[in-house]
Amino acid sequence: MGFNGSSADSCMTNCQSILQDYEHPFISGIQEGIQGKWGITHLAKRLQQIPSCLGYSWEDVIYTNALMMCSQNAATLKKEAARHEMTMNEIEANSMAFFEHVTAHLSEPDLIVAYSNSLQSLSAASLLLKHFGDATTLKFSQPKGYHTTFAFMANLNSRNIPVICVRHMSRFKPEESYIRAAVKLMGC
């Protein structure tokens, strides 16, 4: 789970994205990213890397964002929200409800990987922890620096699901051993 959609995504609503994916099941946005459609290729490669290091096939993974809003970057979110006559609290609440009642309900995930992990500001990790997480389960496999990695348990639809949190992969390359260690910290 990333944080929010980029300005490259802004031409398509979430509904349009779901319909497009349904109509073209063999076209992968991640694969298109590998082939350069996103400009940079390292984020898409890293999005493939993590499931593989945990024994999953990246083709079977659902990639989504915590906030259902596109913006040029995280700093411009409030401005974009105001443009749509919404508050950040409304976007956050609606996005988390959509994630719990639609995405998680339909996909029944074994594991969630959040790849923006600030706990002091808005991030995929902070939103998941705030809305679904058990803070008493928060454990770090790498507590600081470039490879900060941690995990906690989240309750979605009455299911406990481990959430593994790594730094934003467009800027930071995750360390597989810390990810696997975080999974083990959650008893998986």
Model-derived features with residue positions:
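A polyanion-binding, active-site-adjacent surface
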Residues: 1-107, 111, 115, 119-122, ...
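C-terminal capping/extension of enzyme domains
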Residues: 83-97, 120-188
